[in-house]
Amino acid sequence: MFSQAGYNCAYIGKLHVDCPTPNDPERPGKYVEDRVPAWDAYTPADRRHGFDYWYSYGTYDVHKHPHYWDTEGVKHEINEWSPEHEADKAISYLRNEGNVRDPKKPFFMMVSFNPPHSPYASLEDCMEEDYDLYKDLPLDSLLIRPNVNREMKKAASVRYYFASVTGVDRAFGRILDELEKQGLDKLSLIHI
């Protein structure tokens, strides 16, 4: 819709668009994973629903070592917590680094952070400084809804969950700060 209206369109982050098909850009006719077809697949341009800037993956839930396929189909292996990296890419897009969009045209940018995502089990799911905010808090202060069973083993995972939410808030805030810095905050529709 936005693309048809003349907008530059960018997608950054996790998106289940393409089903498992043998579409590995580096090995035509092969799946991106040899052992089984996976939903974590490269999405060819004709299946991106009008997004002309692409930096995405399907279902790879390794938050501190994510990978992405770019617009040209090049796979990027990253060693950084995915929301921080995706915020960096969004800010780069807003600044139009690399001339990735026509600055005379309006743009639509969609950013989809993967965390918070289960299993919320370790520091691989969040940033340590965010976990430190919650690690020593009693579960009763975190699990305040009356229908939560605090005796379940996985109740303690709420600390990792809240740490992930805190980190995502910070990453999203950096994008909002960049919009404000560029004077685009009053001209932008932000949907969370």
Question: Which residues does each predicted region cover?
Answer:
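Active-site-proximal cap/lid insertion segments
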Residues: 56-189
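Catalytic-site neighborhoods of secreted/periplasmic enzymes
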Residues: 1-83, 119-129
